């Protein structure tokens, strides 16, 4: 059951990434049609923009992310239990030892960052270290180490980059349509039914693509959380420790320090504790659903 869940989550992620590239091609074709009457040219430009966005974000420094979250690097002497658990989980996962950081905050939480295992880091809040026993802490750190081993940060970064590129192209295409599109449309002989259909299709794509991209990005993030939960159990062989940790995280207060939206997606549990309609656009699946999946293992 465990390995079936891991395989299923990986398949869903790849399916969603294909959907992302299809969306990028769609918005590129729509913008290309409106700008230069060349859908193929628009697709090529869209993929170049998406590639630039992805490369730029992937190589963002780990230190920058840690600094944004107020994390400080600690040694084995400063945080021996946390350090040894990270060391043990990295050894079982067969990845290099990540750097270890602590965030001064009473709310229990943790996150990992780094585009590959060689430059990765794991951070835990002081609240997490106080609240969790060793088995629960192993579950949380196993989750974060699994994100590193599974290259989740890179996949999530690509998803964010593609969503940003789609939103940017859509925004620029919309402005071009209103401020210069009329002249372009008059320059083309688009009075035919096909031309009108293409125009309507392009407008719909420009309007709806950013929303669709956001939903796909969130779906990818949720699948990677399920995968990290299952992978943590693979490392620790202790589903109950992970379940208890998630339940404690679910009952905790929001983090006291400010966490921006991009960083919030990295944490094991929503640091802002969103409610109401905001949950529709949350990067994490409900903890109750995560616990239910772990219980089925």
Swiss-Prot record:
Lineage: superkingdom: Bacteria
Acetylation among keywords: no
Coiled coil: none
Sequence positions that bind Zn(2+): 143, 147, 225
Gene Ontology process terms (BP): proteolysis
Inducing or repressing factors: Expression is maximal during the early to mid-log stage of growth and decreases after. Does not respond to heat shock up to 43 degrees Celsius. Part of the lemA-htpX operon.
GO molecular function, one term: metalloendopeptidase activity
Cofactor: record remark: Binds 1 zinc ion per subunit.
GO cellular component: plasma membrane
Main location: membrane
Protein name: Protease HtpX homolog
Compartment(s) of residence: Cell membrane
Documented EC number(s): 3.4.24.-
Keywords: Cell membrane, Hydrolase, Membrane, Metal-binding, Metalloprotease, Protease, Transmembrane, Transmembrane helix, Zinc
NCBIfam families named in the record: PRK04897.1
Organism: Streptococcus gordonii (strain Challis / ATCC 35105 / BCRC 15272 / CH1 / DL1 / V288)
Top EC group: hydrolase
Membrane topology recorded in Swiss-Prot or TrEMBL: Multi-pass membrane protein
Positions annotated as active site in the UniProt record: 144
Free-text disruption phenotype from the record: No effect on extracellular glucosyltransferase activity, nor on growth characteristics. Deletion does however alter cell surface appearance, making cells rougher at 41.5 degrees Celsius. They are also slightly less adhesive on hydroxyapatite.
Family membership noted in the UniProt record: Belongs to the peptidase M48B family.
Transmembrane regions: 14-34, 39-59, 158-178, 196-216
